[in-house]
Curated annotation (Swiss-Prot):
Record gene name: arnC
Record organism: Pseudomonas fluorescens (strain Pf0-1)
Name under which the protein is recorded: Undecaprenyl-phosphate 4-deoxy-4-formamido-L-arabinose transferase
The family this protein is said to belong to: Belongs to the glycosyltransferase 2 family.
Keywords from the UniProt entry: Antibiotic resistance, Cell inner membrane, Cell membrane, Glycosyltransferase, Lipid A biosynthesis, Lipid biosynthesis, Lipid metabolism, Lipopolysaccharide biosynthesis, Membrane, Transferase, Transmembrane, Transmembrane helix
InterPro entries found in the cross-reference section: ArnC_tfrase, Glyco_trans_2-like, Glycosyltransferase_2, Nucleotide-diphossugar_trans
Amino acid sequence: MRPYPIHCVSIVIPVYNEEDSLPELLRRTEAACKQLRHDYEIVLVDDGSRDASAQLLEEAASVVDSPFVAVILNRNYGQHAAIMAGFEQCKGDVVITLDADLQNPPEEIPRLVAEAEKGFDVVGTVRGNRQDSALRRYPSKLINLAVQRSTGVAMSDYGCMLRAYRRTIIDAMLACRERSTFIPILANSFARHTTEIPVAHAEREHGDSKYSPMRLINLMFDLITCMTTTPLRLLSIVGFAMAGLGVLFAAALIFMRLAFGAGWAGDGLFVLFAVLFVFTGGQFIGMGLLGEYLGRMYSDVRARPRFFIEKVLRGHPATPAPAITVDGLTSNSTSDQVLS
């Protein structure tokens, strides 16, 4: 692993109904970036907010020589789609994602940049003394464990979006066109060198969590279907096992019928019904998993855009990063649209 030269750092922050926390977020994020030895830009993506968040972002980006970039989506597409929109607009050699709720302090940004300079493709974070309810913490631990087993990447907190990505990883993710994306897992599928560092975690001061129970369930299905095809393989294995047990059970019923007569067969009627219900339940579970994959393929075949950007406002053009080749991976700058 070689040191990674950095010329520009981009901070990508998805925003959804966060007008109360935005002034402090902008102030603290800019103050943290001023500690860097590199050029920087702060890309804030409004994900169809219904409050004044979009107006606040436009005002911040309209100031002369402002480091802020406002990306306004025409409606709510979800956190990960909004981050991907920010990836398309950012120019940094290292890109850091950060939530707008200030539960992860922006003051951690210099630490992530320092780790990325060592040559890591992805720098993850682990929330210390997590300030969430038990109903959020324990399911998160189970999901993180399942992701580790499925991906083989030893990262322990996939739910924390405070992360740093090398430019080549960003370009690789942008080349993927699937509609449903979970960015930490997608990034790790392209990363060669990954690491994690502990970060602080604070209580949310303004507003409520944007993840309702139904959205958490949808996220769980996205995790299952985006990271592995193991459920499909497991479905086949379980199907063969159930078929084998069914054959053995039928053989046992025939033997008992021949050995003990018709009276015994009648006594086993309810057992047969119970087994039938178990098999039927297994079929429905399998069809449900298969339906998740078919729905994903249907969305990809439609080839709808992941998001639609209504406008992009920049205080000044970001310094374009030159092409860099490290460990055989080449990073190229993308084109930019500057609106005033």
